[in-house]
Amino acid sequence: MARISGIDIPREKRVEVALTYIYGIGLTRAQAILEKSGVNPDIRVKDLDDGDIQKLRAVTEEFTLEGDLRRQEGMALKRLQDIGCVRGRRHRMSLPVRGQRTRTNARTRRGARKTVAGRKK
């Protein structure tokens, strides 16, 4: 199994798709990596030789991927929360951050409904 950026990429898939299993690499970036390294995107991972894998590793080293990228994103959110800006407070309260309405239609972010009983008369 080919190991790139600390991730075992699936052997049976095309290289173009297999690279997307690495956090931080989508289809567009995978295509750019393959073009830059000169590896054919249509071959399967199991058919790659060691030279191709080395080329892919060398090109992916240029990007922030996996743990470093997760840490970077976490630090950005923590910074927003620490400075107390609106976005940081919304993240802390698990509410929509980008101005969406919350009276209705915020179920994904707010979680399941918590039913409140009506007042007895």
UniProtKB/Swiss-Prot annotation:
Gene3D superfamilies: 1.10.8.50, 30s ribosomal protein s13, domain 2. The keyword Zinc-finger does not apply. GO terms for molecular function: rRNA binding; structural constituent of ribosome; tRNA binding. Residues 100-121 have a biased composition (Basic residues). InterPro entries: Rbsml_uS13_C, Ribosomal_uS13, Ribosomal_uS13-like_H2TH, Ribosomal_uS13_bac-type, Ribosomal_uS13_CS. It comes from the Bacteria. Residues 97-121 are annotated as: Disordered. The keyword tRNA-binding applies. GO terms for biological process: translation. One of its GO terms (cellular component) is cytosol. Keywords: Ribonucleoprotein, Ribosomal protein, RNA-binding, rRNA-binding, tRNA-binding. Belongs to the universal ribosomal protein uS13 family. Part of the 30S ribosomal subunit. Forms a loose heterodimer with protein S19. Forms two bridges to the 50S subunit in the 70S ribosome. HAMAP family: Ribosomal_uS13. Located at the top of the head of the 30S subunit, it contacts several helices of the 16S rRNA. In the 70S ribosome it contacts the 23S rRNA (bridge B1a) and protein L5 of the 50S subunit (bridge B1b), connecting the 2 subunits; these bridges are implicated in subunit movement. Contacts the tRNAs in the A and P-sites. This is Small ribosomal subunit protein uS13. It comes from Prochlorococcus marinus (strain NATL1A). The gene is rpsM.
